[in-house]
């Protein structure tokens, strides 16, 4: 199985919502998030619970829990070999609809212009 390319979503202003969220996390949570992203690279569409789950409208979540806090990384697939990370959040019970809606909007913008909305580190 070939690896899935994982890209990060970039806003119009050049900012990356995932990086902004990730940089504020404790080191242990960052490590677990990184491991989930690696599993996404390895497994792609085949990644399932408890590591990932489908939410709705083409949006999936990577699931990370540590110390009773449930962190989620929302992502979507673009083509057969790319997963695009929209953003991350901490949640209590279910992922709020507004967060899924935000990911859906980012998915639409990305699909309209992938090059413009792919984050590249400087």
Language-model features and meaning:
Residues 1-70, 79-83, 89-122:
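Basic, Lys/Arg-enriched alpha-helical interface segments
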């Amino acid at each position: 199985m070939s690896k899935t390319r994982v890209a990060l979503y970039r806003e119009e202003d050049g900012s990356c919502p995932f990086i902004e969220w990730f940089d504020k996390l404790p080191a242990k949570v960052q490590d677990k998030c990184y491991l989930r992203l690696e599993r996404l690279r390895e497994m792609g569409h085949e990644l399932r619970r408890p590591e990932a789950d489908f939410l709705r409208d083409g949006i999936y979540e990577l699931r990370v829990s540590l110390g009773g806090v449930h962190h989620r990384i929302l992502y979507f697939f673009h083509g057969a070999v790319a997963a695009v990370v929209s953003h991350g959040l901490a949640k209590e019970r279910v992922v709020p609809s507004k967060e899924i809606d935000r990911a859906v909007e980012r998915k639409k913008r990305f699909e309209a212009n992938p090059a413009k909305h792919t984050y590249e580190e400087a």
